Amino acid sequence: MLAKQTPLTKQMLSELLRASSSKPKQLKKIHAIVLRTGFSEKNSLLTQLLENLVVIGDMCYARQVFDEMHKPRIFLWNTLFKGYVRNQLPFESLLLYKKMRDLGVRPDEFTYPFVVKAISQLGDFSCGFALHAHVVKYGFGCLGIVATELVMMYMKFGELSSAEFLFESMQVKDLVAWNAFLAVCVQTGNSAIALEYFNKMCADAVQFDSFTVVSMLSACGQLGSLEIGEEIYDRARKEEIDCNIIVENARLDMHLKCGNTEAARVLFEEMKQRNVVSWSTMIVGYAMNGDSREALTLFTTMQNEGLRPNYVTFLGVLSACSHAGLVNEGKRYFSLMVQSNDKNLEPRKEHYACMVDLLGRSGLLEEAYEFIKKMPVEPDTGIWGALLGACAVHRDMILGQKVADVLVETAPDIGSYHVLLSNIYAAAGKWDCVDKVRSKMRKLGTKKVAAYSSVEFEGKIHFFNRGDKSHPQSKAIYEKLDEILKKIRKMGYVPDTCSVFHDVEMEEKECSLSHHSEKLAIAFGLIKGRPGHPIRVMKNLRTCDDCHAFSKFVSSLTSTEIIMRDKNRFHHFRNGVCSCKEFW
């Protein structure tokens, strides 16, 4: 590295640090020289070393260097905070903050954005609330960069009212603040709120940019709001906003999430530039919409064109195999990942969940259970949840009970797992077990997630809950629904009441089923929809067996395509047949 006769200077060591910035072993050798020669006394070389270590992610060694420093400046504290946040080490970040306060070091305006991010990563609301008090105490609450991070923290904790209040209270909201708020709304599943604030942003004459467009197209994709999304995209083009490949990929994703696969394929073919995200988006979109063979064909084309797939691409491929019941193909693709020398293609928990879903949906429940037990990674709730869902579909009460016991122990507050187990018992007629599950939910304070459906009409999104009568056209909706139910009963429709409470009369069971949110959304769509145009319904949970059967009959009765996206996948109902082929 250095000739023994060469006299060392601070400048030479600085140049060496710059040349070795991405080489951990070299950096440690230079560190030893700095300490031995006494150049560490004024911290300047250690500062450069610390910055390099943070960039390469060696936070343990970075902390060692930091602790050697004599009264490090606030810039160095912030550098370490930044490194901890970037490397997902929130607890270490909070310990550093505690040390900072114990030593009486005063934070500056750049300190708190990192510490707030650390608390968001940690998911500790009480700690976040306390930190907010510190921010106010030190007088940084009005600064845009700090307030923006606090807003994002509250959104991630589900404290919508606090986040909105804080955002509205910001004296100056620049484009960065607006974009951050809109993005976190979408990331936390609050896309309707994102659209509402986008309209406020436009009303306040804040000029949006390509980052805004990406967030809003993503929001429209989540909501199934194709018309609104296209309006936003057209407006962006008219205002000469840079609709780069990131924007085009977001538009592509929106069409696929709205079930508009044919238009998405046209957009894909017309793209002047395509990257791995473009290809992966199409493959995942095809899989989600039940076009599994198209997804796998596109994957082959992608490889033939010399593009390297990433882990998202393989998620789409495995999902396609799962939705089509292609067990052998799925196993083959998963083996490709396992045997790959590319670390970026090592299977993640999401891929293992896809494999469990594939085996489970195909009725290979015991094989799926054994697969989980032999996994090299610790199975999370997503993986066990996939198996429990399969047990519910195939009505395997014994294995379902085993899996539910694991889930209730690890995630007692997630009501959907309790509900799935309850449905398994209900399907088997074990009503005493159903009562025990519901009693346990009450004891734990676990609540079932409220189901809702939405449908877009003339640039407005209409939401419906079960038995909802708050809609201005509620009377007409229920009249239309009654009319449809009478007609499809004559066609052979019989309400599936097996999972409805056992201690109510049959008439009440049928009434409860007939007022499910997706039925109300479909009835509204039939009233307002244009002839020849599909009805697009978005459901936040898995659609029930009865609503699935109802949708098939309605598509046949009215010759209207119904495109429904539930929690698991898309269902394209055409002429009495669903694209899922009863596999959901």
UniProtKB/Swiss-Prot annotation:
Gene3D superfamilies: Tetratricopeptide repeat domain
InterPro entries referenced in this protein's UniProt entry, alphabetically: DYW_dom, E_motif, Eplus_motif, Pentatricopeptide_rpt, PPR_At4g14850-like_plant, TPR-like_helical_dom_sf
Stretch list, region Type DYW motif: 490-584
GO biological process: RNA modification
Region (Type E motif): 383-458
Compartments, as annotated in UniProt: Mitochondrion
UniProt entry tagged with the keyword Acyltransferase: no
Keyword annotations of the record: Mitochondrion, Repeat, Transit peptide
Top-level taxonomic group: Eukaryota
Transit peptide region: 1-20
Region feature (Type E(+) motif): 459-489
GO cellular component: mitochondrion
GO terms of molecular function: RNA binding; zinc ion binding
PPR repeat residues: 73-107, 108-142, 143-173, 174-208, 209-243, 244-274, 275-309, 310-344, 348-378
Claim: Ion transport is one of the keywords in the record: no
Similarity comment: Belongs to the PPR family. PCMP-H subfamily.
Name of protein: Pentatricopeptide repeat-containing protein At2g01510, mitochondrial
Originating species: Arabidopsis thaliana
High-level lineage: Eukaryota, Viridiplantae, Streptophyta, Embryophyta, Tracheophyta
